[in-house]
Amino acid sequence: RYHCTDICDGESQGTDGINYSLASREMIANMIEIHANATPFDAGVYLSSCDKGVPGNLMGLARVNIPSVFVPGGTMNAGPEMLTLEQLGMYSAKFERGEINEEKLDWAKCNACPSCGACSFIGTASTMQIMAEALGLALPGTALMPATSPDLLDFAREAGRQAVRIAQMENMRPSDIVTMDSFENAILVHAAISGSTNCLLHLPAIAHEFGIEITGDTFDKLHRNARYLLDVRPAGRWPAECFYYAGGVPAIMEEIKEHLHLDVMTVTGKTLGENLEELKNNGFYEK
């Protein structure tokens, strides 16, 4: 088991520290490559949650190219009054206008991050967790689970078992799963969730590690006829922890599946279409 430090963009924004943010993605990918190749493994499980950690892990996963499963680290709980981190700007503005007192501002600051997990809105971290699943590199339904849920630990253990299965039975590598069609699916999901624009930095970098080229024009072409479906902050009303309970990535894909490449492979060893059908039949959405 190896760890690599990550940074928090929320803490570095507005300071010179933000200049280190994108560089940290490269360092994470580099350290994954170093550890995986210095101590050879037959398979890997990668777990990350946040802005540069998720794309860094996906880049490293592609570079190492051993049978692998990615585990999204989940989303933070909402605070009292459904408070989430991106609302602090609103509270700060209200304080500056004299609409709330300092005590209320301090309350918001102290309650906006009540648990571990990615910030509870569709920022870069949430977007990239969703992209990992949309690419077929995470188990179905695992993106943006509440980080405090015991189900997340169960899925992490299942990811380990699945990594062993694909190593023993099929030796299926990330490069056998991810294709241009996989990236087109992910970009359509990105449109449907109104995902972070930072995805335009990260998906091309991940694609590059797979020897695939995508550009801003790729996003533009696919987004023009795409549907926006997700009512989650900052573009919508609800905290990101609601995403999982509404069906998560599979529910989004069901809504847009006529536009998706359903024959792409995933880490389950089955196609996307097979996964979606299996989830419907096994009561996933009712749960």
Which positions does each model-derived feature cover?
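Long, structured ligand/cofactor-binding scaffold of large enzymes
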Residues: 1-72
